[in-house]
Amino acid sequence: MTMKYFCSVMIAIALVGCTATPPPTQKAQQSKVSPTRTLDMEALCKAQAAQRYNTGAQKIAVTGFEQFQGSYEMRGNTFRKESFVCSFDADGQFLHLSMR
């Protein structure tokens, strides 16, 4: 009798556990960066790339801007088609320049 009761309770617990709803998925918050801050980041990226490639900032083209969960990246190239990526933190502070 105890075995029947025990099996019934275990089956009931298993069924209750299967019907539990999964927690909602979390989505990353998208913060907006101001247009003036974006322009400042672009100017800083161009200046850093111009210094690295020993050319003028006017010969540097920024071709892309991507926002990630905790950082930003600006892609660009020189007039000689040399690619680079500028990385910024979540506050828009320059981190580093990567040559590609």
From Swiss-Prot:
It comes from the Bacteria. A lipid is attached at residue 18 (S-diacylglycerol cysteine). GO terms for cellular component: plasma membrane. The keyword Membrane applies. It is a lipid-anchor. InterPro entries: YsaB-like. This is Uncharacterized lipoprotein YsaB. It comes from Salmonella paratyphi A (strain ATCC 9150 / SARB42). The gene is ysaB.
